[in-house]
Amino acid sequence: LEYLKATFPDEDLYFISDCRKSIAKANQKGIKTWLAPNPEMQWQGVRAELNHPLEFRDGFWFKTLARIFVLNSFMQVHQNQEVLQIEADVFLFPSFPISKFIDLNVEISFPMESYDRGIASILYLKNHKISEKLTDIALIEFENNKNLTDMLLLGNIAHSRLLNFLPLPTLPNDMQNALNDANAFGLVCNNSINTSGVFDGISVGQYLLGIDPRNSRGLLKLYRSQSSHAINVDNLTLGLNIDENVVLKDSGRDILVFNLHNHAKDLRLYKEKSRKKLLQKRVKSSGQGEIQELVIKVFLVSVLKSIIRKVRNGLHQQKI
């Protein structure tokens, strides 16, 4: 938040959360905040019927879907205003073209992870009427599919006419050889908002910075290209320009990557010196195959949680 405020000082930045402690910390930094209504209370029925395991990452699958409700609640308070939602683990380079989203002539815009799935790492909503319509669509989709995720929901919207949708470009047209799925070409390779670069939905950031080590008990998996994603990052050449902005290199030209999905939650990105060192290291080693690093802190927390869980299960069995 401090990085965003310093990098984009003229933008109307809000931190949205249902955690009072996080809201208080942001307020202390002089950042505008909005305390969201508790989604577990507002969407009790959805939470109860959702087929995804609620114990995974403290209700991860429910919370990512419930963000639709939270955004709508925020936009009903801030009516007739465009909103560009940036996930907390998405890093924006100073080159990020926020001005391109002003008066965008569509109702909703986001990048696609694959042909079938969208991703809300960057999500543009035109106004409060569209956010309300999106919420209504989400509830209808959920009634038809209890395995619904926010990514499937956005994918369905991308392939329907329920909302006027514009896919954010994630790969230049002339780099289509890096596609895993040729069917995704029109959703991934486009210049829909006339920019000099591309937006990272998840593929480049996850490849370069690693998969969240909490998924593997502290093991950070780097340079893994996901076959389920539209883009095969192994077929791209990554570099850094003079401003230390990640670029896609092709035939002597550099294509800006405006943001990185920081799936690994690496906080070094947000300090200039540590960011420069981190990105130089990661870019230099890219294209040489998958590697793994052990994140000690995450590993120890994982072990501690496992011990606590086993103790609780043992106590529960004794009571029975």
Annotate each language-model stretch with its function.
Residues 46-58, 147:
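An acidic/histidine-cluster motif and surrounding catalytic segment
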Residues 65-69, 148-156, 298:
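A structural signal for well-ordered alpha-helical segments within the folded catalytic domains
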Residues 3-4, 20, 24, 32-35, ...:
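Terminal, low-complexity, charged helical segments
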Residues 1-51, 76, 127-133, 259-312:
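N-terminal anchoring/stem segment of glycosyltransferases
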Residues 132-290:
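Catalytic core and acceptor-binding pocket of nucleotide-sugar-dependent glycosyltransferases
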Residues 93-156:
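Conserved catalytic core of nucleotide-sugar-dependent glycosyltransferases
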Residues 63-109:
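GT-A fold catalytic core of metal-dependent nucleotide-sugar glycosyltransferases
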Residues 18-21, 85-90, 114-115, 128:
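An acidic- and aromatic-residue-enriched active-site/binding cleft used to recognize and process polar
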